Amino acid sequence: MKKLALSLSLVLAFSSATAAFAAIPQKIRIGTDPTYAPFESKNAQGELVGFDIDLAKELCKRINTQCTFVENPLDALIPSLKAKKIDAIMSSLSITEKRQQEIAFTDKLYAADSRLVVAKNSDIQPTVASLKGKRVGVLQGTTQETFGNEHWAPKGIEIVSYQGQDNIYSDLTAGRIDAAFQDEVAASEGFLKQPVGKDYKFGGPAVKDEKLFGVGTGMGLRKEDNELREALNKAFAEMRADGTYEKLAKKYFDFDVYGG
C-alpha cells in the first residue's frame, strides 16, 4: 500500500512538473529597442549586445526555451506584446503603475534613476524655473516622456520626442536641444563615458517620482502568461544566488546596478 501511494505521488509530481513545463513556450520572441546602450544596442557587426541582451539569453537558457529578438521602437513594444506579435519585452522597461494596468512584469531586474544630461558649460537644473523656454529630448514611450509632458510641457518647457536614443544625443551635440532626459545608467555608460559625451555632464540631481518612474525595470509579459513569468522569476533568483547576475553586470558597470 505504501509503495502504491509513493508511486502515485511520484506520478502526480511528474505530471505537475510536465504540465508546468509544457505551459512555457518552446520559442519566445523578445521585443527590444536597440538604441539604449549599454542595455541594448548593436555592435559594429550589427549584432545585438548589452546587459539586457545578456540577461535575456541566460534566462532563456535556464528555462530551456529558444529565444529570438525582434527589434521595435520602444513605444511599439507594449502594443506588439498585446497583439501577440512578440512574447516578451526586454528593453529597460520601467515597472510602473500605468504599465501594470496593461501588462505583467517579472521581478525587478535592475534599478535606475532619471536624470538630465547637459553641456558642461550649462547650469541647467531639473526645475521648471531652470528649464523654462528650453528644449528637452526624450525617447518616445518612456517614463521620462510621460513625466516631461505632464510636469514640464504645461509650464513652457518644450518636450521633443524621438524614436531612438542615439538621435537624442545627436541633436544634443548639434545644439538642437538643450538637454536630454533619460535613465541615469544609460546616459552614464552609453554617452557620458564615451568620446562623444566628453563635453557633457549630468544636469542637477535625479528626478524622483515613484508613481511615474516605478520601482525598477523588468521583463514585460502578457498578464495571462503566469507560468512563463514564474519560470523567469525562478531562473532570475537562481542567477542572483549563484553569482551569474553579478558576473554579467560587471561586464558593463562598476557599481551595483541592481540597487536597493
UniProtKB/Swiss-Prot annotation:
Changing R176 to D/S: Strong decrease in ATPase-inducing activity and histidine transport. It holds the Pfam family SBP_bac_3. It comes from the Bacteria. Belongs to the bacterial solute-binding protein 3 family. Keywords: Amino-acid transport, Disulfide bond, Periplasm, Signal, Transport. It is found in: Periplasm. L-histidine binds at S91, S92, S94, R99, T143, D183. GO terms for biological process: amino acid transport. The lineage of its organism: Bacteria, Pseudomonadati, Pseudomonadota, Gammaproteobacteria, Enterobacterales. Disulfide bonds join C60-C67. The keyword Signal applies. SUPFAM superfamilies: Periplasmic binding protein-like II. One of its GO terms (cellular component) is outer membrane-bounded periplasmic space. NCBIfam families: 3A0103s03R (TIGR01096), PRK15437.1 (NF011965). Changing D171 to A/N: Strong decrease in ATPase-inducing activity and histidine transport. It comes from Salmonella typhimurium (strain LT2 / SGSC1412 / ATCC 700720). GO terms for molecular function: amino acid binding. InterPro entries: Lys_Arg_Orn-bd, SBP_3_CS, Solute-binding_3/MltF_N. Residues 1-22 form the signal peptide. The complex is composed of two ATP-binding proteins (HisP), two transmembrane proteins (HisM and HisQ) and a solute-binding protein (HisJ). Has a bi-lobal structure; the two lobes, one bigger than the other, are connected by two short strands and are in contact with each other, enclosing the histidine. Both lobes are involved in stimulating the ATPase activity of HisP. This is Histidine-binding periplasmic protein. Part of the ABC transporter complex HisPMQJ involved in histidine transport. Binds histidine. Interacts with HisQMP and stimulates ATPase activity of HisP, which results in histidine translocation. May have some additional function(s) in translocation that is independent of the stimulation of ATP hydrolysis.
